């Protein structure tokens, strides 16, 4: 199959550091290739360019990984009438409707609920149940949980820090790293955002790792928690 994966166009794919969605899209394309399919990444914020690039090839399936592009789904369908279309929302607060207006997500969510043309690949069962609760068309809802490309990670049976835990993820209120910072034996890695009481000056915060370094060293620990 010939499959197009549409990214946000905010940062490069694959990312050099933090970029959970971008890493996921890269892993999808890599895995599709290993399975004998052709996974093409289109990664630009320019809606016109997205439609143009999609129309230049004959795709069997198009998966849009940025919910902000909901407003061009009909245009994509018109440009690629033979392709199956799906969209995924990676918004972390789908199940918290009180947050939607503050993040500009209310219009996007309304469209996702009312959509009955294109598949909605939910990245978690939590999101699936939220859509279902709000009367989305269940025939268009499919659960496709996020995962990690395990083959890229260095594996060892004897980690360097067997009694230590690594918490890997962007430092932000949603992930609540600040609650665990006083626990001995836990180290934190991730892009710091100045929106949380997490203290980045403490020794347990190791900063942000480059992607390749992360692949080599995330298994240095007895337990690694990757929070995307």
Can you name each region flagged by the protein language model?
Residues 3-4, 61-63, 76-96, 121:
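Active-site proximal beta-strand in glycosyltransferases
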Residues 53-70, 84-86:
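Short N-terminal targeting/anchoring amphipathic segment
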Residues 97-100, 143-163, 198:
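Acidic anion/phosphate-binding donor-loop and adjacent secondary structure
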Residues 101-120:
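Membrane-proximal helix-turn-helix segments that form the acceptor-binding/catalytic region
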Residues 116-132, 136-154:
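Donor nucleotide-sugar binding/catalytic pocket of nucleotide-sugar-dependent glycosyltransferases
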Residues 121, 157-187:
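Conserved donor-binding/catalytic core segment of Leloir-type glycosyltransferases
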Residues 171, 192, 199-222:
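Conserved active-site histidine-acidic residue motif and adjacent donor-binding/catalytic loop
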Residues 226-228:
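Conserved small/polar residues in nucleotide/adenosyl-binding loops
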